[in-house]
Amino acid sequence: MANYCFTYLFYRWTNLITAPSLPATTLTLRCYNRMFQECSRLTNPPELPSTSIAESCYDMMFFGCTSLATAPRLPATTLAKNCYWGMFNGCTNLELPPSLPATTIAYGCYQNMFYGCANLIGVPNLPATTLQQYCYYRMFYNCQKIKLNTSNTVDYPTEYRIPPTGKATTNYSNSVSGMFTNLPFNINTTYYLHSSNVIV
């Protein structure tokens, strides 16, 4: 697979409902960048089995896919620079994110990943303990149905913390800047999710 090989391949194919198979297990620079951007009727995404990913490989892959309700599984545990940047940005029908098991993360890897996913109600556990610059920057920004509180109440019963266990470290103040819309978020701090939200 060559660098940039499928960039913009189905850009604004508004009649595309089911994506083709993408069986590659080793990815390259920007290989799927904006591949399905603004495919407004896409409901069946491809499986994405690769555990060997590359810089910006899924960058904006499903940007503006407003009918997408199910996200593909993302099994990689070691990430690359900007690999998931804006991947589901503007997927307003998406309710649940995929689980994100990566323990080794990279610059900007989850930046803007779910930006503007207005119906998103789930958040993933994020187990990495060494954070990088912009890694979670605006990850859930404008996801208005995700609600966090600093206090445990009847309406906010579920603990949410980054990382779920242990202690995270970062040398960058922007690692989690703007991660959620409704309150400033800090690592190694327990917050509480609204009863309408779930952890995946």
Segments predicted by a language model, with ranges:
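Structural signature of tandem-repeat unit edges
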Residues: 1-2, 11-29, 37-55, 65-81, ...
